[in-house]
Amino acid sequence: MKIVIDGMGGDNAPKSNVEGAVNAIKEYQVDLIITGDKDLLEKEFSNYEFDRNKLEIVHTTEIIENEDKPVKAIRSKKDSSMVVALNLVKEGKADAIISAGNTGALLAGGLFVVGRIKGIDRPCLCSAIPNVKRGMTLIADCGANADCKPKNLVEFAAMSNIYSRKVLGLENPKVALANVGLEEGKGNDLVKRSYEEIKKLDLNFIGNVEAREVINAYTDIIICDGFTGNILLKSAEGVALSVMSLIKETFMASTKSKIGALLIKDDLRKLKSFIDYSEYGGAPLLGLNGGVIKAHGSSDAKAIKNAINQGIKFSKGKVVEDINQFISKYNEENKNNEDE
């Protein structure tokens, strides 16, 4: 098994990618490939001691920048660190790619280079957010598909369920549908029709969940279209950052509050860790013929290391194979139904 890293992707590239790779090799004994400017990467790796037999550097001459147009960049920058890494997954030379680079380009590259699993209509981007009751909750989809059909949300539910079981280790994950109310029959046409279809799946489906309960809900997975999911994700991130900012401001306001902060510093550290995105690794793009994991653009070494661990679990868990089996069976059972 090998994981490939887009060495030049991300705000802190290549430093964070290199340090994250080194830490992953030390902790997981994983074989890694990293793509990018070989001289620059070699210089960064020279700062660390690790098993070099676990690392292969593939030289590339181009970088996909954040301001590049996604599809155009994938088609025109064939020797970019991202495209070369995607091709390694396509060719079976790597099991999964980790990239903190241009999100749109990675989504386009996953679709056009790695390719969809046969029968999957739309790949799904899943991102984890903190959850007070469950530790974390997956949002699927969180931005890959702004407009969806009920069939898409059914696929998202099944794929994220497989991912939660195989990668996150949840035995029977709870699945809920994002809606404006808890009662069955609430919501727009997409949500109501999706509710009826998801109910038919062999999942632990618990019904609807409202936005105000996203970080406090008794569910492991929240299903929605990508437009809704991205708003939920960004809102949760914004609330978390605002809360931490308010806490810091409050404790720095006076000598008395600073002393109070010292007394509970371990608890504050736990809170910070709970809402730190780097703890959750990256967001997998499910429904492709290989592992594609999008790390946060500002990922540090810890986030990259955790994303690599996701890639390892993704491959060992045979997520692609399980999704393939599901969609083959589902489409066969529903082949006579009118396309939604």
Swiss-Prot record:
Q: Pfam families, per this entry?
A: FA_synthesis
Which terms does the record give in the GO molecular function aspect?
phosphate:acyl-[acyl carrier protein] acyltransferase activity
- Superkingdom, taxonomy of origin: Bacteria
* First-level EC class: transferase
Q: Which GO terms describe its cellular component?
A: cytoplasm
Keywords per UniProt:
Cytoplasm, Lipid biosynthesis, Lipid metabolism, Phospholipid biosynthesis, Phospholipid metabolism, Transferase
Task: Describe the function of this protein.
Answer: Catalyzes the reversible formation of acyl-phosphate (acyl-PO(4)) from acyl-[acyl-carrier-protein] (acyl-ACP). This enzyme utilizes acyl-ACP as fatty acyl donor, but not acyl-CoA.
**Protein's UniProt name:** Phosphate acyltransferase
Q: What organism is the protein native to?
A: Clostridioides difficile (strain 630) (Peptoclostridium difficile)
The gene for this chain is plsX
